[in-house]
């Protein structure tokens, strides 16, 4: 798998040398149709009806969304599909879907296909789109562990958002604003990478700690060997998601991937510019003689 990923990481992506081997995507939202994969409960995702949040994890089974017992994994009951337009204003199931892990992990070439297949039918301001990237060479990971990466990616996304004519009240702008209350709570523009790389399991109560995972970029090396971008919102509206919303989400992920490769290219150019050639002196040999009397 890694041999193929390494070969793929030498391709061009949007005209830039691609150094990303594998891609992971997390999509949060609400579903009224079976996405064909497990819908995992996520406490940060909220829709404004008390019975919309599932009490247990969910997954798909024979084309139906089902509740699953947390301990046994057995089906508890199927979730009915809304029969009327009024009922469809609220999702049947809420939470997140997570892309496959190795050896079936996504790449820069097929992540969009997966996103189009499983994207939720409803999203709101509580829903996030997280992007994980990994590398065939650990040196590229270490090059990203710097406070400079977050402002670089934020600016790249801001340029993209302006080019897309994204409305001023869209949640993208809130998440790109380091002073927005939601951003400070869920994707703070802080660099905690030196401590995050050591965390071996997901901590939901880590806010305020030196290793909090709730930052714009989370360096979850010890858990997943990935860099996680947590600053994107989901694209769409509570009343429904359109095909263009999904395509805009795909383009947002593409912007994050391209920004990663751009940053790595800049780092490599800087390293070459700062390299110093050292000319070794020829060896000096001295002979010492002794006279014994």
Region locations from a protein language model:
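Terminal catalytic/cofactor-binding subdomain
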Residues: 1-119, 235-237, 247-267, 271-276, ...
């Amino acid at each position: 798998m890694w041999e193929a990923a390494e070969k793929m990481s030498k391709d061009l992506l949007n005209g830039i040398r691609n150094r990303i081997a594998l891609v992971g995507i997390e999509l949060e939202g609400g579903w009224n149709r079976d996405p064909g994969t497990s819908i995992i409960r996520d406490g940060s995702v909220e829709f404004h009806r008390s019975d919309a949040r599932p009490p247990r994890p969910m997954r798909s089974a024979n084309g139906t969304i089902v509740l699953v017992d947390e301990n046994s994994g057995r089906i508890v009951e199927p979730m009915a599909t809304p029969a009327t337009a009024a009922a469809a204003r609220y999702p049947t199931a809420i939470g997140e879907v997570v892309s496959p892990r190795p050896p079936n992990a996504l790449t820069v070439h097929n992540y969009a296909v997966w996103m189009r297949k499983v994207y939720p039918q409803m999203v709101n301001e509580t829903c996030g789109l997280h992007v994980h990237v990994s590398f065939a060479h650990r040196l590229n990971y270490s090059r990203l562990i710097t406070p400079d990466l977050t402002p670089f990616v934020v600016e790249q996304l801001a340029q993209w958002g302006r080019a897309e004519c994204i409305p001023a009240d869209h949640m993208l702008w809130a998440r790109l604003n380091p002073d927005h209350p939601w951003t400070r709570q869920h994707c703070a523009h802080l660099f905690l990478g030196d401590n995050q790389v050591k965390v071996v399991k997901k901590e939901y109560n880590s806010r305020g700690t030196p290793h909090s995972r709730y930052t714009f970029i989370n360096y979850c090396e010890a858990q997943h060997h990935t860099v996680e971008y947590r600053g994107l919102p989901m694209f769409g509206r509570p009343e429904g998601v359109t095909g263009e919303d999904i395509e805009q989400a795909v383009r947002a992920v593409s912007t994050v991937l391209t920004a990663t490769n751009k940053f790595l290219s800049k780092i490599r150019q800087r390293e070459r510019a700062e390299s110093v050639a050292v000319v070794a002196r020829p060896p000096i040999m001295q002979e010492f003689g002794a006279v014994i009397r």
